Amino acid sequence: MSYTIQAQTRTEIGKGSSRRLRHAGKVPAVIYGQGKEPVSIVFEHKDIINIQANEDFYTSVVTIVLDGKEVGVRAQAMQRHVFKPIIEHVDFVYA
């Protein structure tokens, strides 16, 4: 199964801006690997909360539409809230 997430490049980096994004229902994330510069991104929480429940999300290539360009990535790490069903941050690596 293929998964697609719509994302935007983040311009503000840091704890404060990440908290503001989370309160707005968004998930901060980063894409890194393959000798490329890391890219900080943000996407809607509702876009990932349902697809991450599928086991093959963690093993298959996920397509991220980043500012109009498609990027193939794999989920590397995911940080979740301690007791709420909220994803706080995701690390992706280039596929």
Swiss-Prot record:
The keyword Ribosomal protein applies. Keywords: Ribonucleoprotein, Ribosomal protein, RNA-binding, rRNA-binding. One of its GO terms (molecular function) is 5S rRNA binding. Gene3D superfamilies: Ribosomal Protein L25, Chain P. HAMAP family: Ribosomal_bL25. InterPro entries: Rbsml_bL25/Gln-tRNA_synth_N (IPR020056), Ribosomal_bL25/Gln-tRNA_synth (IPR011035), Ribosomal_bL25_long (IPR001021), Ribosomal_bL25_short (IPR020055), Ribosomal_L25_dom (IPR029751), Ribosomal_uL5_bac-type (IPR020930). The keyword DNA repair does not apply. The lineage of its organism: Bacteria, Pseudomonadati, Pseudomonadota, Gammaproteobacteria, Alteromonadales. This is one of the proteins that binds to the 5S RNA in the ribosome where it forms part of the central protuberance. This is Large ribosomal subunit protein bL25. Part of the 50S ribosomal subunit; part of the 5S rRNA/L5/L18/L25 subcomplex. Contacts the 5S rRNA. Binds to the 5S rRNA independently of L5 and L18. GO terms for biological process: translation. GO terms for cellular component: cytosolic large ribosomal subunit. Belongs to the bacterial ribosomal protein bL25 family.
